[in-house]
Amino acid sequence: MLVVEYDFKTIKLNYCLVLLFFILIGCKSTNEVTTSPVKSVPIEELSSVDMKTWYQKDYQQDSIPGISLDKWYKQNNKKPKNKKIIVAVIDTQIDLKHEDLQGQIWTNLEEIANNGIDDDHNGYIDDINGWSFTGTKSGGYVVWNSFEYVRIVNNWGSLFKDKTEFQIDTQYLHKYRQYQRAVKRLEERNKYYRNWLKSLKYNIAVYPKVKDTLKYFFPKEDYTYHQLDSMYNKYKINSKTYKQRRDDNDQDLGALIDCMMANLEVNHKTLENIKDLEVQLDSVVNKSLNLIYNERLLIGDNPTILEIGYGNNNVSNTIKGVRTIQDHNTMVSGIIAANRTNEKGIKGILQNVKIMPLNISPSGDEHDKDITMAIRYAVDNGAKVINMSFGKEFSMHEDWVLEAFKYAEEHNVLLVRSAGNESLNVDKNESFPRDIPLGGLKEICGNFITIGSSTHKLDSTFVSDYSNYGKNNVDLFAPGGKIYTTSASNSYKSDSGTSLAAPMVSGTAALIWSYYPNLTVTEVKQIILESGTAYDIEVLVPGGEGKKVKFSELSKSGKVLNVYDAMELAKKVSKKKR
């Protein structure tokens, strides 16, 4: 499966020829749910209509391993006790004008719009619908962030460059090792992206000849990847690799087939697609990977301290000639809150919800400062759930973020994070933000859930091949493969990623609190984990080269989100507290 996110926050490309593009439950049990694990049963391929709503279905009723949302709505006849639950979505910018999000966006009623005054005295001027922590001094927005490992090399180089571990004081060893890892990663990524960019330039140069030549063999230009692949044997083409052809600037039939296969591998069917990706890769190389580039100069803050009020209030900014970055948040928010009653597009998890968009995620890695301040803003302004569909492999100021986690816990706020799309075991590989240190078992806080991605197929491919996993560091799985949701520019589309699995859980938590407001954050977390559906099947381990394990071994709960069972358990727990 190909997962392409053009903002380069998460890139998972099987680019084939071009080379390269989210135990026990750690808190006291609230109640026991005894459900027999579901065994694998072959199901028919879903229709295009069913694929748009598969994740809301129930396995027992529909033979589709969704989250049983439709089942709950069909049987529920009660009205929620809370009129509106606020869910903060810490992410990119958002399409505030999307038809399916009208009436679903949080409004700060204590603030008077556009008067240039901080009416509610929260430190943020004119924060009507949220805040952009990556908004610039000029009223614009940052499009390209540096990667965190670039920042580490930049900031810690004076301390550690050219030194051995024996020369480092023990109190700085952790930082030193992270610095060494960052240096290595920067070297690897520079090579990786420059090689990819070189390949794209080659593909662009030969593209007209590729189209003309293949039209001779396929007059209707209806060729598939596999048809092109079969031409190697049919026409006895030499066995040179793509890299060899590229470096030799070959333009024979083999080279032309190679280039088009590479384009089809990532669904780049037009020259415009390839040129757009070239522009983005050029920015990755010259901005995100550039030791000199500093996006914080555009914002005007001090990145070494925590402070209130930097950025701007425009969470849905569009500037002519500047790449927009609204798609990711719009997709995530639609899953949670798309209007269920307007007969348009899709139906979100719940109707009585308000999305609080908080921008921290341009292309590149999020800053720990922005993560921290966004969490605190969300808590201080009434959010009950915070969705964080982002992640990175380094963290300069993890202590800031963990303090924000605890601040949220003290205020009874749930944090939901996507596990990431690198096909990695995050029990053994660094992934931030997190609530359990690498190699540890104990949670730092009780209000944090990490979500992996599942598919609509209850077979060995049930776990999405891109999804990160971990018996200790991933709590639960939820549908994330081929999810049809809202998209930027008032549109809809299907996409995949753990980024789309996390809001399934965020929406469920909001739904629970809307009916059972007396529950604590630890109870809501426990309810969600305990009530999930267990599937007694063996699945392919993501990135495991064909290795299979029990599905239950890939997360702490060993389960998939089940809204119906979560609401039933929440009802029982809530009733006992009255």
Per-segment meaning from a language model:
Residues 73-81, 323-326, 347-350, 366-387, ...:
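Mature extracellular/periplasmic domains of secretome proteins
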Residues 91, 420, 497:
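Active-site glycine-centered loops adjacent to acidic/histidine catalytic or metal-binding residues
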Residues 5, 28-32, 379-390, 399, ...:
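C-terminal subdomain of the subtilisin-like protease fold in secreted/lumenal serine endopeptidases
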Residues 24-26:
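C-terminal motif of bacterial Sec signal peptides marking the signal peptidase cleavage site
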Residues 72-87, 92-367, 444-447, 469-473, ...:
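Subtilisin-like serine protease catalytic core
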Residues 300-304, 413, 434-514, 518, ...:
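Extracellular S/T/G-rich loop segment that most often corresponds to the catalytic His/Ser-adjacent loop
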Residues 31-42:
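Short, low-complexity, disordered segments immediately C-terminal to signal peptides
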Residues 1-11:
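N-terminal secretory signal peptides that target proteins for export/translocation
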